[in-house]
Amino acid sequence: MAVARAALGPLVTGLYDVQAFKFGDFVLKSGLSSPIYIDLRGIVSRPRLLSQVADILFQTAQNAGISFDTVCGVPYTALPLATVICSTNQIPMLIRRKETKDYGTKRLVEGTINPGETCLIIEDVVTSGSSVLETVEVLQKEGLKVTDAIVLLDREQGGKDKLQAHGIRLHSVCTLSKMLEILEQQKKVDAETVGRVKRFIQENVFVAANHNGSPLSIKEAPKELSFGARAELPRIHPVASKLLRLMQKKETNLCLSADVSLARELLQLADALGPSICMLKTHVDILNDFTLDVMKELITLAKCHEFLIFEDRKFADIGNTVKKQYEGGIFKIASWADLVNAHVVPGSGVVKGLQEVGLPLHRGCLLIAEMSSTGSLATGDYTRAAVRMAEEHSEFVVGFISGSRVSMKPEFLHLTPGVQLEAGGDNLGQQYNSPQEVIGKRGSDIIIVGRGIISAADRLEAAEMYRKAAWEAYLSRLGV
């Protein structure tokens, strides 16, 4: 490792000079608030620094005596690093996609694959090791062997132990502690900042697990932010904050889909099940006897039982049209619905039109990023476009209708329809997942349940079963 040590000081300095290390208060992918954020994506615009990083990564692999046939960079920041390594040293490279394309070869791994060969993984930063493991699994499914990974910076938060538990040796050019030591010696950061970051590292270490799932005896895993903590985030939308607070208070992340055709039944459901839910979803255009007086009664019940009203209108027209649909017509949705939703097909105009009406009334909007029906086209690039649109209009958009967590920003809510206690489907293409799958594994926040409650002999009992299942899945996700 002599070459790596000799080059470490200038390398850390170079990365600091291009603002790869940021100190302050940052929300990480996990939802944790961190005093440091590491972003190496900018080095692609600095060829000399890119080559310097690639060279030291390759030298680290050589010094470790690793034998390998191909190289694969973890998408996306490590891809250019792997490219430079392979081009400079004439080594075959493989590219792992994050998702399968709907056209062409539809392969997850591009390049010449020879089953039985060993592939070396390149990564820029390792925290928990999850991204490396995802790449390992994809490569192993192609018949390749993976034994080692080279990383530029190990954040020392359990990633090395987690990878070791899965049979992967992690070799780092530099640890976060060493990087801080160098920056402090160069007087680029002060002792107080170094201490704060080191305390954060020590207090937030991910638990490793063996192949059988049993935890190894290392420090406690970090918890993601609770609903209550997310409600207090400085950039949280007021409607999202209100919803998260009442969810925490009532211990419910259940939204009732009240798809009934009579106003009397709608109000009965709201009154009887209101204490069990955080939100009531309406399809107001299927009410046979709709009046604005009915919605006034619903607002009264919502205030009494502390739940929000969500009109599942699915706006999908040009801005001027949705604006009129939202504020006018016989439904006057903006006058009573806390939240509405919209498709992103028309482009940002649909959000801008709704926003003109909703912002002054302190309303919010959910974008449809994924759908729970068979053959839905709301996948891939469509979903990513929905996330970008939400980020660009976060003053009005509070989250998503989706089958899983599509944004790692804790300010955004994720609501998932198509939930039943047992997975399955119907004869019209609806697919159902369990609360544990949706909340515990896919990272959603709120389950939307309709027929599982409406069709039950005892609706209150059914609602409580769903509430408890969803809340327990949420607590399990927190590690409580």
Curated annotation (Swiss-Prot):
CDD domains: OMP_decarboxylase_like, PRTases_typeI. Gene3D superfamilies: 3.40.50.2020, Aldolase class I (3.20.20.70). Signal peptide: none annotated. Residues 2-214 are annotated as: OPRTase. Residues 215-220 are annotated as: Domain linker. InterPro entries: Aldolase_TIM (IPR013785), OMPdecase (IPR014732), OMPdecase_AS (IPR018089), OMPdeCOase_dom (IPR001754), OPRT (IPR023031), Or_phspho_trans_dom (IPR004467), PRibTrfase_dom (IPR000836), PRTase-like (IPR029057). UMP binds at S257, D259, K281, T282, H283, D317, T321, S372, Q430, Q431, Y432, G450, R451. Changing D312N: Loss of OMPdecase activity. The modification N-acetylalanine is found at A2. This is Uridine 5'-monophosphate synthase.
